[in-house]
Amino acid sequence: MPIMQEGRDKRMPFLFLSPSTQYFNPYVTTGDERYWMNALADEMMPYLHASGITVTRNDPDGSAAQSIRDSNASRQDFHLALHSNAAPQALAGQLRGVDFDYYPTSEAGLRMANI
């Protein structure tokens, strides 16, 4: 359940924003997954803050395991991992869109996946 933010009359979520730490996944054009997903997170931050959402970010130089530990320790309402997916050669250029993963027993996770 979201935590009441001081000075607000509605409840706003606390978000752990976790862009990829995978520098070893190069992109075809330039850069790598860590670079581009962190650039995306940088662009998202002003919009999230303007919406009243409190955001904590992972350490881009850390590991995925450290990001998970930090997220769990911070007790955020929602963990948003930003990653890009590769396709097998047979499906190159055919897959688009986003994937949402959540615990099957999490009603809140299902609600967030359907937003």
Residues covered by each model-derived region:
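Active-site-proximal helix/loop segments of hydrolytic enzymes
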Residues: 2-26, 31-115
